[in-house]
Regions:
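Charged, low-complexity intrinsically disordered segments
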Residues: 15-141
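N-terminal export leaders
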Residues: 1-6, 12
């Protein structure tokens, strides 16, 4: 029994140092104070307006502890009908960081839609690198 206690202590000590891999099954990046997904930006507007557009409090949809905001009722209805299409890939984590083995929340202002899927990035140059070779990042993430 002492061995297992020692092993548990060692694992507890090194666990935070191990890189964390996120997958598409990870929760959506959410503001811990407001509960808003992707900082309240409208995920549908990236597709319909080709723009990062702040959602409005009167057009919200909630589920699984996450609140999504939308620019209008039409965008809210589209998202509710097809969240798998409009929700950010990798839960909104930056795929270029996932390739390096770390999770870093994407910034909704740095984005790209490729292959009819939304990807968020934490830096502009990460978005540019991804856009230049999306296949590489998607196979490695």
């Amino acid at each position: 029994m002492a061995f297992f206690g020692l092993l548990a202590g060692i694992l507890a000590a090194i666990w935070p140092a191990l890189p964390v891999r996120a997958t598409t099954s990870e929760r959506v990046v959410t503001n811990r104070y407001s509960g808003l997904a992707i900082e309240g930006f409208d995920p549908v507007a990236y597709f319909t307006d080709a723009a990062a557009t702040q959602g409005r409090p009167e057009f919200e949809a909630a589920g699984s502890g996450v609140v999504w905001r939308f620019r209008n009722e039409g965008n809210r209805a589209s998202f509710v009908a097809h969240p798998e299409i409009y929700g950010p890939q990798f839960g909104g984590y930056d795929p270029t960081d996932l390739v390096r083995g770390v999770t870093c929340a994407g910034n909704p202002r740095f984005w790209v839609v490729i292959g009819n899927r939304l990807y968020l990035f934490n830096r502009e140059h990460s978005r540019d690198a991804f856009a230049a070779d999306p296949a590489r990042f998607l196979t490695e993430a």
